Amino acid sequence: FRGFCDGRNEINFVHAGLSRRLCERGIASVRFDFAGSGDSDGRFEDMTVSSEVEDGLAILDYVKSLDFVDQSRIAIHGLSMGGCVASMVAGLRDADVCALSLWCPAPDVVYNMKHKMLCGVDVSDIEEKGYADYEGLRVGLGFYQDALELDPYAVAAKFTKRVNLVHGDEDVTASIHCSERYKEI
């Protein structure tokens, strides 16, 4: 699962490279664009964390339906906000996921949005305008309203299997404290 504002290939094609390396080792992978991002239909402005969790659950069901997939070996990988989404999908579907890989997970996107901050940008006018401008993209009011209702750590805590956390201590987008908190739960 990709980060906030990115597509299935991610910055510098990091997910495309990961998919190639997995394939070389005989491991199938699925990359996709969430609704409203990349080549997918929909508007970015309509995206919420909950809608991305729903997309993630649908992708998990799709992967489970593939004849060549060993259902006991399905793992989920997420980067940045995609790590937050991946952790929530894994928490909601613990029985269907054998492992979780999180690269610099960023549930702080959700928690900071409760204070009308988005990736370090003050979006306190989101209710007045109905959207926030973030690096030229419109983030809809629904994203803020959805964030008010979510507790990603509580959902992720329901996942009981292996988790691989990778996080740099100089990450300026996602605080290392996010991974430290995931480690605690």
Q: Where on the chain are the PLM-derived regions?
A:
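Aromatic pocket-lining residues of Rossmann-like dinucleotide-binding sites
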Residues: 22, 89-90
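Alpha/beta-hydrolase active-site loop
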Residues: 46-67
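Short, surface-exposed "cap/lid" segments of acyl-processing enzymes
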Residues: 1-33
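Glycine-rich His-Gly loop
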Residues: 1-4, 80, 168
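Glycine-rich "HGGG/HGxG" loop immediately N-terminal to the catalytic nucleophile
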Residues: 33-47
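The alpha/beta-hydrolase serine catalytic core
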Residues: 91, 95-185
